[in-house]
Amino acid sequence: MKMTRLYPLALGGLLLPAIANAQTSQQDESTLEVTASKQSSRSASANNVSSTVVSAPELSDAGVTASDKLPRVLPGLNIENSGNMLFSTISLRGVSSAQDFYNPAVTLYVDGVPQLSTNTIQALTDVQSVELLRGPQGTLYGKSAQGGIINIVTQQPDSTPRGYIEGGVSSRDSYRSKFNLSGPIQDGLLYGSVTLLRQVDDGDMINPATGSDDLGGTRASIGNVKLRLAPDDQPWEMGFAASRECTRATQDAYVGWNDIKGRKLSLSDGSPDPYMRRCTDSQTLSGKYTTDDWVFNLISAWQQQHYSRTFPSGSLIVNMPQRWNQDVQELRAATLGDARTVDMVFGLYRQNTREKLNSAYNMPTMPYLSSTGYTTAETLAAYSDLTWHLTDRFDIGGGVRFSHDKSSTQYHGSMLGNPFGDQGKSNDDQVLGQLSAGYMLTDDWRVYTRIAQGYKPSGYNIVPTAGLDAKPFVAEKSINYELGTRYETADVTLQAATFYTHTKDMQLYSGPVGMQTLSNAGKADATGVELEAKWRFAPGWSWDINGNVIRSEFTNDSELYHGNRVPFVPRYGAGSSVNGVIDTRYGALMPRLAVNLVGPHYFDGDNQLRQGTYATLDSSLGWQATERINISVHVDNLFDRRYRTYGYMNGSSAVAQVNMGRTVGINTRIDFF
């Protein structure tokens, strides 16, 4: 067992309440709100951090219909997939999913529930807002929160009737249809909602062996229901949500490295089409109880996922069905009320994940390799987050989290008739801390500084590898130092930050696709600056601009890649958009024009596979035809810029996945109420 400590942070988080409780209440501020993101408007953790919140109308205007399109509205975030949608490659502030495709650098939450890693890329249904927290969020969110947190908050049913249907078509025979109905079942007591979604995003890649010409896309069917029991004049409420998602995809589609404008896949003669089917079931029970001084939240959530995946890899045909089960329980207590000197959040957390993988690599004439593996991972944690309001302008915050992680693996198989197998167990303890301080220079201008830790627990490879023992990799740990500012008025919003993150014992994937193994690759340093601004220069009109410059490198004492750039981290990025409303006698017109720039980055630790700088231009025009009818047209990637989204070495040559190119579409929404 190994205990990791950072005494100044952990002790600071523990001692802060004792110091603060010796002070008298000196201010009168708004009530602390506990949201699905665990943050509140008064807490230091919410104010002394770089964050972005995007509303549902802003998501709709930008055409964000799935989580992998969130970079359009969340500056600094990069999301692609490595092979297919099961394995997201995410980077934020120089922290990258190159470290582990099964544990993205940024964790996705939906209504406060962490999603399975293989469910990070998903369609969005009935979203109310999306929140991005940058930098390690380990004290509140625990493992795999080194780069930050994406929290999706969905619309909860209440006494207001809501309902709509949506429909749209776009390039490559793609289409989208959606139905939503929400409101009171018995007003003052019980509320409910239902959402149905069918989303087809076909590709245009060609397999010469089969003649298929629509590869590289996805087809998703999703349904969810919610019930909310909230009696009037009672201090408690309960909720239940259930959803099912099934997606079929043909995304394991690659072209030659230098053939990014081509449509023919780089495959051996006679290779079948790639195919993947993923089905995910989710259930959540929640409860809230409110007193004069405290609010208590309880969440219990379960996810079950199974997928089948077949794809050609050189002369081999790979079959990799997999099953996942995850359950999460969390009890959280937070202070309520005005004029508090100290605000506090305390919580207990448990997460248990179980996985089974069957894999088979077959040659045209005989089996090459087959294996069956079982892995488990469990986290037990207790956390505390505290804010001491020294004056009405100055506050300090501190937090501490104690986590106990354990994992196990058991696998067996055969390679060319030779059996192999092993098993193992490991456990680890972590103590994480964070400290921050913020000061309001004026009523509109805040400056802050923050030190925070993040980590990824020790564990085992998900995919068994012949010839390798069941040896665990050690926990990966990081610490982030940040200095930032935020300025906000009715017309201007501006935030900027500079940061430095040091990561040690990085967990990095290496090896051929389908046979990658995780190992600790040493240390890395990431430094950068970021800027985000919005100017509301006229009624109904706004101009957004953002940019970042990041240097993320393995240190010289890293065993495998010393001095190299960390994969999947662009050296710089920028974006700008103009949004407006033009009133006419025939209804409001809503134009939008957006440009996004992504800097050069690598797909491998050896820095041999490089994607250069590229920019895309998106445009849309909405028309509010009546109070209840909205029609919009959009053109994404107006100039049809083609670029690589992922690549790897296939023997002595490299192959790449490429983006879809220009997409033209039209959408219609009709509201019922």
From Swiss-Prot:
Record's bilayer topology term: Multi-pass membrane protein
Induction remarks: Induced in absence of iron.
Gene: fyuA
Pfam (any one): TonB_dep_Rec_b-barrel
Disulfide bonds: none
Function: Receptor for the bacteriocin pesticin and for the siderophore yersiniabactin.
UniProt main location, coarse: membrane
Protein name: Pesticin receptor
Protein's cellular compartments: Cell outer membrane
Domain TBDR plug: 41-155
Motif (TonB C-terminal box): 657-673
UniProt cross-references to PANTHER family, sorted A to Z: FERRICHROME IRON RECEPTOR-RELATED, TONB-DEPENDENT OUTER MEMBRANE RECEPTOR
Taxon lineage: Bacteria, Pseudomonadati, Pseudomonadota, Gammaproteobacteria, Enterobacterales
Locus of motif TonB box: 30-37
